[in-house]
Amino acid sequence: MPQMAPINWLILFIVFSITLVVFNILNYFCFFYTPLKTSQSLNIKFNKLNWKW
């Protein structure tokens, strides 16, 4: 069974690296973050305590 030539491994590594970088760039820049309205959705009641020492 013949082995792959080193230039073939190099091309395979370069293609894999370029694919990985392009995939990561597309995932990073194509992410649309839509934050929820935190003031309306969260109703947190705070108890204001006046400490008398």
From Swiss-Prot:
<dbReference type="GO" id="GO:0031966">
    <property type="term" value="C:mitochondrial membrane"/>
</dbReference>
<dbReference type="GO" id="GO:0045259">
    <property type="term" value="C:proton-transporting ATP synthase complex"/>
</dbReference>
<keyword id="KW-0138">CF(0)</keyword>
<keyword id="KW-0375">Hydrogen ion transport</keyword>
<keyword id="KW-0406">Ion transport</keyword>
<keyword id="KW-0496">Mitochondrion</keyword>
<feature type="transmembrane region" description="Helical">
    <location>
        <begin position="9"/>
        <end position="29"/>
    </location>
</feature>
<comment type="subunit">
    <text>F-type ATPases have 2 components, CF(1) - the catalytic core - and CF(0) - the membrane proton channel.</text>
</comment>
<dbReference type="InterPro" id="IPR001421">
    <property type="entry name" value="ATP8_metazoa"/>
</dbReference>
<comment type="similarity">
    <text>Belongs to the ATPase protein 8 family.</text>
</comment>
<protein>
    <recommendedName>
        <fullName>ATP synthase protein 8</fullName>
    </recommendedName>
</protein>
<dbReference type="GO" id="GO:0015986">
    <property type="term" value="P:proton motive force-driven ATP synthesis"/>
</dbReference>
<comment type="function">
    <text>Mitochondrial membrane ATP synthase (F(1)F(0) ATP synthase or Complex V) produces ATP from ADP in the presence of a proton gradient across the membrane which is generated by electron transport complexes of the respiratory chain. F-type ATPases consist of two structural domains, F(1) - containing the extramembraneous catalytic core and F(0) - containing the membrane proton channel, linked together by a central stalk and a peripheral stalk. During catalysis, ATP synthesis in the catalytic domain of F(1) is coupled via a rotary mechanism of the central stalk subunits to proton translocation.</text>
</comment>
<keyword id="KW-0812">Transmembrane</keyword>
<dbReference type="GO" id="GO:0015078">
    <property type="term" value="F:proton transmembrane transporter activity"/>
</dbReference>
<keyword id="KW-0472">Membrane</keyword>
<keyword id="KW-1133">Transmembrane helix</keyword>
<keyword id="KW-0813">Transport</keyword>
<dbReference type="Pfam" id="PF00895">
    <property type="entry name" value="ATP-synt_8"/>
</dbReference>
<keyword id="KW-0066">ATP synthesis</keyword>
